[in-house]
A protein has these predicted regions:
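Divalent metal-binding pocket/active-site signature
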Residues: 138-146, 154, 168, 186
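Acidic/histidine-rich catalytic cores of soluble enzymes
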Residues: 69, 166-290
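C-terminal/domain-terminus segments
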Residues: 319-329
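Mobile beta-alpha loop/short-helix "lid" or hinge segments that flank ligand
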Residues: 133-143, 183, 272
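Short acidic/histidine-rich active-site segments
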Residues: 308-314
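Acidic-and-aromatic substrate-binding clefts and catalytic sites of carbohydrate-active enzymes
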Residues: 49-54, 72-83, 105-109, 144-148, ...
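N-terminal pre-domain/capping segments
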Residues: 2-135, 151-158, 162, 169, ...
Length: 344
């Protein structure tokens, strides 16, 4: 069982890790680390608002347009290496805000695969820290795998996150869990009838078994917070306004969340429509829909939160628009909303 650490122990262990990294990699320690900008700052999410642009052009586009950070992609940056990446980010003055956790999904793989992944996770975390990034992101499934009982899955997830926390705390890195709010994610079923892979139906075959009913897991801010608190001091939340809105989240939910548990923020907007009709690819640019983004950002300001804010407008709204224009639209719309709300 993992022994929880208090804030002082957490900071002491993180400091020792940084000192050890400096001894092992003096060239890394000597180079300038791209520091996190003060307050709330805009970070480019290329998969949403610079589609089709690869690394390192993503970072160059972020700097050209006016972003201060980038939600970066693991594979090409890892291939480029520490020195080249640090030099590029320092040249562009772009902060490496957050990255999706590489490797298998540690929350759903079997026990053997999970245990086998921990050594590589330690190395990957050290790499992220070496380029100045202190945030890994992982999406939470809104239902349990295979219809597993919720209590059983909760125990597995918190136990694994505690093990991940122990590894990442050495490198002063946080895990950011993103819950999925729209109803469609809670209706997902483990398997179902129908053909797969384009295979023709088998004549006279018996009907397939009925799909396992979905078992909802964690899909709201309040419950994600409880999961984080049960898992480790450096386990936090990606607060996505889209998922907050479609989980019927409230401003009070944000005000009840300790600022240190919010690791990253995504923002977009939504049409007014029945919850059962909402699909994840229907997102609008911030300010174009019905979300209470005033309450959202003012609540973040009230709790004293600072960090990266990424426009994540997924779907047709930005189709057929050039990547640079996507980035400019994302930056301009998010900036306008944040300035209107008095947080930027």
């Amino acid at each position: 069982m993992t022994v929880p650490v208090n804030r002082r122990e957490f900071l002491e262990r993180a400091a020792l890790s940084s000192a050890a990294l400096a001894l092992i990699h003096p060239t890394i320690a000597a180079a300038a680390v791209p520091q996190q900008p003060p307050g709330m700052f805009l970070s480019l999410a290329p998969w949403a608002t610079a589609r089709g642009v690869g690394w390192p052009d993503q970072a160059r586009l972020a700097a050209k347009v006016g972003f201060k950070g980038i939600d970066w992609a693991w594979g090409p940056v890892r291939e480029a290496g520490v020195d080249a990446t640090r030099a590029l980010l320092a040249e562009l003055r772009i902060h490496p805000t957050i990255v999706n956790m590489p490797g298998p999904n540690v929350l759903t793989v079997d026990d053997a695969a999970f245990k086998a992944s921990l050594k590589q996770l330690d190395e990957d975390t050290a790499f992220a820290a070496a380029i100045g990034c202190t945030r890994f992101q992982r999406t939470l499934g809104a239902t349990t795998p295979g219809g597993r009982p919720k209590d059983e899955h909760w125990k597995i997830v918190t136990g694994r996150l505690a093990a991940v926390s122990d590894i990442m705390v050495k490198h002063k890195v946080h895990v950011s869990l993103e819950f999925l709010g729209p109803m469609v994610f809670r209706m997902a079923r483990a398997g179902g009838p129908g053909r797969r892979g384009g295979e023709p139906p088998v004549p006279n075959a018996p009907p397939p078994p009925p799909p396992a009913p979905p078992v909802p897991f964690v899909w709201s801010l309040a419950e994600t917070l409880r999961l984080c608190e049960a898992s480790g001091p450096n386990i936090g939340i990606t607060l996505d306004a889209w998922h907050w809105h479609h989980s019927e989240g409230t401003v009070a939910d944000i005000l009840s969340t300790p600022r240190e548990r919010i690791v990253h923020v995504h923002v977009s907007d939504a049409r007014a429509m029945p919850p059962a009709d909402v699909q994840d690819n229907m997102r609008l640019l911030p300010g174009e829909g019905v979300m209470d983004l005033v309450g959202f950002f003012q609540a973040l300001r009230t709790i004293g939160w600072t960090g990266g804010v990424a426009c994540e407008t997924i779907g047709a709204r930005l189709d057929n628009i050039a990547p640079e224009e996507q980035a400019r639209l994302g930056l301009a719309s998010t900036t306008a909303v944040m300035q209107r709300d008095g947080v930027l």
